[in-house]
Regions:
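Bacterial N-terminal signal peptides that target proteins for export
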Residues: 7-29
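Bacterial N-terminal signal peptides
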Residues: 27-37
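Sec/Tat signal peptide C-region and signal peptidase I cleavage site
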Residues: 40-44
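Active-site-proximal helix/loop segments of hydrolytic enzymes
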Residues: 45-49, 68, 72-223
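Short glycine-rich His-centered loop
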Residues: 48-67
């Protein structure tokens, strides 16, 4: 998925932008944000099902560099997320399980079949330049923002990216058409050669999946 550059500005604790701070400052920001999102534990949210959407597929390759296709990487991470969630007893629906094309409306329609569901769309990023790197989490709506905050904080913690941000995207049809809380996670830039090599490793893919699952569980547990 192509990216647009985002300004590095101060935002609320539930919307975090990281632009390569020194390590102690980075840890302080992350710790404070975790504290804010976890203060006031309430009854767990009722989540009946997690919809895992592996971005692109079939004729839609997504971002690509050489023989590295976003659609393939997204599906690998999606399968890992599914496996981890099922191990926790959480029902999961995949929007696709193979290299097939599904429209954005079709993906949202799958999610909209269920009540008390959440929707996680998994992607990898690219840009015309080769220097951009990091993880990004997009959301739409208030509950989407809360879900994005939990997932993104775990992405920062597990992956330790150089850059990362969360922001609302009103131009992403798959999020707007989904009635349940929905986010889109960009797991790394395959247009950056160093980051692309990391994205291709099973260890990085597993850490992406663990971060997403940890974030889902935190969202489920904390208001």
């Amino acid at each position: 998925m192509s990216a647009q550059l985002v300004s590095s500005r101060v935002i609320s604790p539930k919307k975090i932008i990281v632009r390569r701070p020194v390590s102690w400052c980075r840890n302080l920001v992350l710790g404070l944000a975790l504290l804010v999102t976890c203060i006031g534990q309430a009854d767990a949210r009722k989540i009946s099902r997690v919809i895992i959407d592996a971005g692109h597929g079939g004729k839609d390759k997504g971002a690509n560099r050489g023989t590295v296709y976003e659609k393939d990487l997204a599906l690998k991470v999606a399968f890992l997320v599914e496996k981890m969630l099922k191990a926790k007893g959480m029902p999961v629906t995949m929007t696709r399980r193979s290299d097939q094309f599904i429209s954005l409306r079709g993906r949202a329609d799958i999610a909209n079949r269920y009540s008390n569901a959440i929707f996680i769309s998994i992607h990898f990023n690219a840009h015309t330049g080769t220097r951009l790197n990091g993880v990004e989490t997009y959301y739409f709506g208030d509950e989407g923002q809360k879900l994005a905050a939990h997932v993104h904080l775990r992405m920062l913690s597990r992956l330790n990216p150089r850059n990362g941000n969360t922001r609302q995207r009103q131009d992403l049809g798959v999020l707007k058409a989904t009635r349940c809380p929905a986010i889109l996670v960009e797991c790394g830039y395959i247009s950056n050669s160093a980051e692309r090599e990391k994205c291709l490793t099973s260890a990085y893919q597993e850490n992406c999946a663990k971060a997403i699952v940890d974030g889902i569980w935190a969202y489920k547990t904390y208001r």
